[in-house]
Amino acid sequence: MTSSVRLAFLATLLLLLPLEAQIQQANSANVNQNVGQQDTGTLFTGTGTNLYYGVNLVPFGPEVGDQEVNPGLLTAGQTIDLHMYFPFYGGLYNYSTLSVNGYIGFATVLDQGPTLNVGPDMTDWPRHEDPAMIAPYLCKQQIPQNLNPGMRSGVFYRLMMRQSLFGRQTGSNMNMGQATYQSSFFGQSASKACPGTPDSYVRCDSQADYFLEEMQRWLIEGVAGAAAFRADAALVVTWYNTASAISGRSDIDSGQLATYQAIWLTDRTARLSYVILNYDRLGFDAADFRQNSRSGRCQALFNGGNHTGLVPVDPTQDFKNTPKVLAQRSGVPQMVRGRYMFRVDDVVRPAGCSNKTGGTYPMLIYPNIVNMLGEMTVDVNAICLDKSQTYILMIEQRQTATCTVLTSAIARCNLPKIFDWGTKTVYFQPQSGGANDEKAFVGYIYFVPPTLDPMRLDIGNVYDWFKNPLPYTTMPLVWYPRNFTNPEMTQHMDQVRMNDDTLYSTQLGLYVIAYREYKDDTIKKFRPEHRVICRLATYSNRNTYEYRWKPQEERINLYQVEQWYMNDWERQNDLYHYRFGYLKLAPLKTNQEQNPQQLLSGLVSSPISLHFLWTSNNPQFATTTYSQQDESARTEYVKKKSLEMCHDWYDEDGAQWNFIRDTETNSSCPCIERQAIADIGRFMPHPRCSQAFRDITCTTSIGSRNCYMSSQNVMTTYAGDGRQYNENLARFPTHYGQVCCYDDQGHLMQTSYQPVIKVTPEVPYNPGFPMRAYEFGTAPYMGQYEVPGLSAFHNDYMPYFLCCKFADFRCQMFYWRRPSSGCQEYQPPAYGEVMGAGTFNTIDNDKFIFNEPGVYNGLYIPHTLSTPEVKVQIRMERYPNRRVDFSLLGRYMAQQDLVQPTNATVVTGVVLEATGTDRVHVVARKDTRRFRYRTSIIVGNILRYFDTMRIQRFKGVMIYVNNVERGQPEIYVVLEEAQIGIRVRESYAIDIDRLSEYQESMGILNIAVSVPPQYGVRPDGDKTREQEIRQRYNLPRVSGVFRPFPDQSSGSYLNTLTLNDVNSETYRQQIINMYRVQGSGEPGSDQNINNQGNNYGMPTENMFTTSRDEDKKFEVFPEAQMKSGPIFKTSPKYETGAYRFYPMTGQVLNQRLQTCRDMQQNTNINMQPLQSQLTGEYGQTQCPDNPSSIIQDCGDSVPCLYDYYNFNAKLLGLNVKNEWNTFTSDRFDASRQYNSCGVINIEYPEYLMKTSSMSSAYLQGDVARFECFQSHWIYGVHEYKCGIVVDRNQRNIIDPRDYRFEWNKGEQPWCRSREKQNFLTWLAIIGGIFGVLVFVILIFLCCWIVKQKKKGEAAERRGYDMASRSSMTGSRGGKKYPIHESEPLNEKRFDADTYRDDDFYPPAREEQYAARNEDLHGLKTSV
């Protein structure tokens, strides 16, 4: 009776199946409703709330549009077209191979033996295949052929794509938020498929849009940062009721079957990619029978292929014991069992949560680039969370962050302020600490300054905020609403879901935070202060569907303040102590008014000027309308206050240490731009003013073609008493920085000339100036001058705007405090490069071509008291023969023959470190992996990305990327303390997108090295006094492949590169024995162990395959494998025997080129069949395709001849020719010693101009002429020439060491207006005339006085004579002549003044005549 009842029930059930399918199609409200409602104990298909699908599977099968893998291709796999590119593990794939063996593959899988082996540790690639694959359950399986009538089995697949990919509006015919899934796709013909996709497994209708939306909701629930991902396509593959490869009917009947699913999602740009794995049930552990798991063990993994790396789905001990545990556990326990999520686009990162306790498990943190100001939140995927416990995020060397459990897979942690720039290792653990075993979860967060934060608040054009008047009364404000959640709802996440739109409904306040560095009397120090001064506006965070990925755009009313947090007195006084500030958008708090200085987590903007707030509280500007007069009044008020603040800054800065002595002495600017380009270790392109980097938003130096700044804090040394001239003291960092700007001629621009050149504000002449606060900050990034970006704005940038932009006629005051460098103390670096196929120009100017595979010590500098230890290693590999046709694989060619090496080696990787720094690897990516990134930058075993931040700072290392060309092909690495820098260019930084014959770049690295002069390396290569100088100044021995002969002079520094320098045995073995790391060459090349290199302490560690102790915890990260192995790995067949490497010398190269050219151009060769056959074989193996073109295109360029011949690529040959010519020319200019007189200090620049205004006026031989405008006259010495001045001692003997370069002496030029000059001229004329008159009068007076004096003297003498005569008359009875007579011919003239005596009267006129006649006739008179 019981059996008959069972049969009746089964028959009824079978009859209800079609009806149930119709119900399922008509009402799909129950589809996926088990999410978050997992039935207890439900482990198998058909026993949950859905009759057909498991509790965790998406709908599959023919009724939803799936196609089934062809039974004849189940084992080998059926290849399908994806119709767009999907990224996976660094590669891009538009196809996939689906196999019954539980994988989605992208290459042929070697399936011999019981176990499918993949990955670096299990395969012998390239001798055997190592395919890339997504393997939910990799082991040998089968589709049972003899199933009972009630059971189905197969591998199903479909491709879901958005309608918008085909020009249709997404969601135009669907109701989001409701379950409208309809299974009406079955039987669709190819003609009705998506446009351009003839396969019927492709869906691009409303059902596909709905499915992709559902997958996004799943990802948001389980993956940190998935809210930023928008799925546009998905590949769904379902393995339904597969059985073990070795299984019988009894095994199948007993339920030893497996059902699982893989969903691979990507966006339309193929940038992001996620995989969701669903395990419904797993009935076997291996491809064995009778539940035996000793053979053909099943694996769940992601393999990058070609030894790129392997990531297991579950790296726990439970999985090793039994892989079936995947169906019982989950990476998202809050959703359903058996579900795991991964991000797989570039490197596979596990998402969701894990139950791993010991060892190391990488956390997924979003965002992992965080503003150092803190007060932000990050989402963390780590351990599977329990809401009853408290979890913390421990930050290396900093305080912990409190975390809130959002779901069982995601925790949200509130970060404090972390004043640091660089990577901090973080650990995620329960609060109970040592009471638990969860110590495995390790991650990293990169803290950045606010000026470089890629997630900063978008406030429009930042430079509009620094204009007076502001160009607009409102400014834009843009943010993504999904970055904010309701702070009240986050405390009750057990009641809401992550994809609930109400979670993102909140009120946001826009706050102004002012910054200054002030004296804190409590700690007796100056420290930074961040003060919330007001709230400008309040906005509602939009949470509707369209704002999931669409940004919210609002406007900021600049002259309206919603709430002040300063009283009236503070607004009138303290507000002007804050030179600048920034905006922060954060959710409102209920008690915001009681504690306004504490804000919730939010987004901050770039620094802005606060001058728009100066008039917001002023009553004279409190008008309801805005007019032109109001704008002018505001502008004048800002000018007035800026003038006061400029003077305050001038006085404040003048009271501080004169840092110019440090910047000019220890970081003097390069004299010409080519020196700045070559000096990689000390100077770098300015992040906002560089033509080469295509960023010229430099408002403080408009007019300069390129600006460069010191790539580290200015290093200085002890300068006190007791220092000897030959002492080489240790250097220590300051908090200063140097900025050098160059004009279009490559000459330095000078601040002293700015007032005489910049006639109007629009004249493009704004030189660079040194900075008291280095823009990139100073470790430990905590105190005054040390906050990156903010300290620079407070001490340097904002004073420039106050004095030079806002106030009038105060720019010279600023430049008095910030004078530019005159390059008088600059010494050029030693500069070398390796390019192409091993063409070297060393740092001491030796030139040669060296080829030999292996890892070499490129540069080694031992540690001294004054310099750190520096280690640079390069990896050279044999370049593959690109004439190999990959399409022959599997027919005429084996896997090991795909990579056939040539006899030319290229650099494929470089690694460097110094004392106390992180270890940095820059390696080229493998073939077929260079689509998005052409190189990999690995710091401390962690792969770093430079998509949003092209300047990144690590421990003692600065790395920046020129992202003009796609794929980060140009990387700069600077060791800060050592001041040694390298430049890495992949494939000459060619724009591969424009080359139709190349699908990806070539994988060749060019390495340029710059060594500063403190190491004693002469750039000209003269080593005559090398030993003497090294001993006298205690200099280290600099050696390596970039300086292979430090103790001997090769003489090649005086010559150019010739064919005799190509793999010459005179230096080959010396380089190999001295600098190659043991064990890194080809097999058999290290038979004779040579310790010659160890005599000088050369490193023996291979830094590509080893890790430092502090980095070993990250060795489990998949990128650790990317740096270890070669990128052009060959099979052992090509490393021994006739295929092993042998160097080609210049003579052999020349002979083969001549032979091949003769074979190409000699028509008689083809006339003899036997000779034609022999020459054909020779030409195929030894000749390039067009040898005559090589000789013609290359000419006498040896690097071009060598690379063109070996690579058989004209593009590479011509590029190395151009690179070599450019390098030699630039090196000659960069290594010269330029003599500088500095600049002429102009103190009174009114109406003065320089002729020619932009010409160089600081180098030896330069002439500077100054003139006045036509309204003024010039005075002083107005022509100067820079020349050498030799000092002579007292014996007039010239000392050749005692000289200097100076301008000629003279009074400074100055101008006087013509009106004033005319006035003074007329005044001088009038004064002259008046002076002449006065002079004449004075002369007359002098003469009159003299005359009167003489008259007086005459009168006295006459009175004496009269007295004498009177006495003589009285004694003798009279004179010779009577008194009334005179001497003959000397008639005495009548003088009234003479005869004033009352007793004497002159005689009558007649008596006088009578007397005269008497005298004439009576005396003997002689005339």
UniProtKB/Swiss-Prot annotation:
Membrane topology: Single-pass membrane protein
Primary location recorded for the protein, binned into one broad class: membrane
Location(s), subcellular: Membrane
NIDO domain sequence ranges: 184-347
Protein name: Uncharacterized protein F54D1.6
Species assigned in the record: Caenorhabditis elegans
GO cellular component: extracellular space; membrane
Region (Disordered): 1364-1401
Transmembrane segments: 1322-1342
UniProt KW keywords: Glycoprotein, Membrane, Signal, Transmembrane, Transmembrane helix
Sequence ranges on the Extracellular membrane side: 29-1321
Top-rank taxon: Eukaryota
Cytoplasmic face residues: 1343-1423
GO terms classed as biological process: cell-matrix adhesion
InterPro entries: AMOP_dom, DUF7658, Epithelial_Barrier/Signaling, F54D1_6-like_C, F54D1_6-like_Ig-like, F54D1_6-like_Ig-like_2, NIDO_dom
Domain AMOP span(s) in chain numbering: 638-818
Biased composition (Basic and acidic residues): 1378-1401
